[in-house]
Amino acid sequence: MSEPARLISPEKRGEDLDMTLRPQSLDEFTGQAEARANLKVFIEAAKNRGEALDHVLFVGPPGLGKTTLAQIMAKELGVNFRSTSGPVIAKAGDLAALLTNLEERDVLFIDEIHRLNPAVEEILYPAMEDFQLDLIIGEGPAARSVKIDLSKFTLVAATTRLGLLTTPLRDRFGIPVRLSFYTVEELELIVRRGARLMNLPMTEEGAREIARRARGTPRIAGRLLRRVRDFAEVARAEAVTREIADEALTRLLVDNVGFDQLDKRYLNMIAVNFGGGPVGIETIAAGLSEPRDAIEDIIEPYMIQQGFIQRTPRGRVLTAIAWKHLGMQPPKEMEAAQFRLFQEDD
């Protein structure tokens, strides 16, 4: 799979874990204004009552700040922060070890909770609801149930695929928070803040050029900023201008809306091979030699949000925006066909 090597992948990489660029408080955090305002209220109320914050579920595409917000919440609550991910918790004993080491009101963050083992998920229910572990010790006739009391903790979980969560698990989160893609203006503020922390002189136009190509995602904005800095330093530029940012990102094959070669292959395949669609996701995955999950989680969310493609009952369809971006004319019958298709959708 080619996706991990992509510069504009929103998935985590080692360089993205640099804490110096991350905001340390809700006031420093840029974007997600409604979510931040609500979290401030919930955190303040929990602190005033001396109680553990209710369990929180963050939902949204990768790279929007779910992990950062969880860390900030623990910091503002004045408690310890523990972090893991769904695939790492392979068996009930792994979860038990995590939960029994938590202190009162601590925050446990589970990323990719939709990938949690179903057997482990069953153990999590009483832990979240009653702060108890109900474990089966031994096997066969000698097996017995053991209840272990836990400190009252806050589970903060993150998922990119809300539909993959079971209803019993989803219903146990008292505070659901949906995160959305960032505006160019918000990303520009994030880029300028990152440049200041790097001691990197940058013009407003330079910051905006990076923000425009960051796919609405702070993690990608930070990565593009680091790569543009490399080009600027080697060129011995006094500051990152729009021209320097444009040249660097163009050389890195990131176009003016943040699409790379894989995105263009996706759009071109639908346009050229299937006349603009509709075409099913499995056909697209086979044509690109990419897993379906990667297409649905990584490639498509930003395209859909920006109006480049439509999902219909019969498959993906290119919009007029996509045809214009490709520099192609849609088939003459496309407009009438799409009109009928979306009527069926209604």
Curated annotation (Swiss-Prot):
Molecular function (Gene Ontology), one example: four-way junction DNA binding
Residues that hold DNA according to the record: R292, R311, R316
Database matches in NCBIfam families: PRK00080.1, ruvB
Region (Large ATPase domain (RuvB-L)): 1-182
Region (Head domain (RuvB-H)): 256-346
Reaction catalysis annotation: ATP + H2O = ADP + phosphate + H(+)
Localization per record: Cytoplasm
Region (Small ATPAse domain (RuvB-S)): 183-253
Binding site for ATP: L21, R22, G63, K66, T67, T68, E129, D130, F131, R172, Y182, R219
HAMAP family: DNA_HJ_migration_RuvB (MF_00016)
Keywords associated with the record: ATP-binding, Cytoplasm, DNA damage, DNA recombination, DNA repair, DNA-binding, Hydrolase, Nucleotide-binding
GO biological process: DNA recombination; DNA repair
Subunit-level organization: Homohexamer. Forms an RuvA(8)-RuvB(12)-Holliday junction (HJ) complex. HJ DNA is sandwiched between 2 RuvA tetramers; dsDNA enters through RuvA and exits via RuvB. An RuvB hexamer assembles on each DNA strand where it exits the tetramer. Each RuvB hexamer is contacted by two RuvA subunits (via domain III) on 2 adjacent RuvB subunits; this complex drives branch migration. In the full resolvosome a probable DNA-RuvA(4)-RuvB(12)-RuvC(2) complex forms which resolves the HJ.
GO CC term, one of those recorded: cytoplasm
InterPro entries noted in UniProt: AAA+_ATPase, AAA_lid_4, CbxX/CfxQ, DNA_helicase_Holl-junc_RuvB, P-loop_NTPase, RuvB-like_N, RuvB_C, WH-like_DNA-bd_sf
Recorded family membership: Belongs to the RuvB family.
Binding site for Mg(2+): T67
EC number from the UniProt entry: 3.6.4.-
Domain notes from UniProt: Has 3 domains, the large (RuvB-L) and small ATPase (RuvB-S) domains and the C-terminal head (RuvB-H) domain. The head domain binds DNA, while the ATPase domains jointly bind ATP, ADP or are empty depending on the state of the subunit in the translocation cycle. During a single DNA translocation step the structure of each domain remains the same, but their relative positions change.
SUPFAM superfamilies: P-loop containing nucleoside triphosphate hydrolases, Winged helix' DNA-binding domain
Function: The RuvA-RuvB-RuvC complex processes Holliday junction (HJ) DNA during genetic recombination and DNA repair, while the RuvA-RuvB complex plays an important role in the rescue of blocked DNA replication forks via replication fork reversal (RFR). RuvA specifically binds to HJ cruciform DNA, conferring on it an open structure. The RuvB hexamer acts as an ATP-dependent pump, pulling dsDNA into and through the RuvAB complex. RuvB forms 2 homohexamers on either side of HJ DNA bound by 1 or 2 RuvA tetramers; 4 subunits per hexamer contact DNA at a time.
Protein name: Holliday junction branch migration complex subunit RuvB
